[in-house]
Amino acid sequence: MMTLRDLINKLLGRETSSANTARERLQLVLAHDRVDMSSLTTDLLDKMRKEILDVVAKYVEIDFDEVAVSLETEDRMTALVANLPIKRTISGEIKFKKADKANKDIKK
């Protein structure tokens, strides 16, 4: 898995040192070892999925029929992957601007 730092170094023609590569690999191993995957029960994953969807749905309209949330493990690293198809954005920004203006008027 290429990190952002690796990509930038590659684009700039820099080579990563073996020490940096070893350090990054060790950090991944330590992070993986700290996470007890057995503690991620189906109930906990369902709760996380619901909370993620609730937060994202505040800002965009989601196609809930096509939502996919999964755990993927690759190279000793586990990731929570959420595929959230967006139908359209919600114009919450206008509401915030109006609310901010109202709050400023009240303070005056």
From Swiss-Prot:
Keywords: Cell cycle, Cell division. It comes from the Bacteria. GO terms for biological process: cell division; regulation of division septum assembly. InterPro entries: MinE (IPR005527), MinE_sf (IPR036707). Pfam families: MinE. The keyword Acetylation does not apply. Prevents the cell division inhibition by proteins MinC and MinD at internal division sites while permitting inhibition at polar sites. This ensures cell division at the proper site by restricting the formation of a division septum at the midpoint of the long axis of the cell. Belongs to the MinE family. This is Cell division topological specificity factor. It comes from Prochlorococcus marinus (strain AS9601). The lineage of its organism: Bacteria, Bacillati, Cyanobacteriota, Cyanophyceae, Synechococcales.
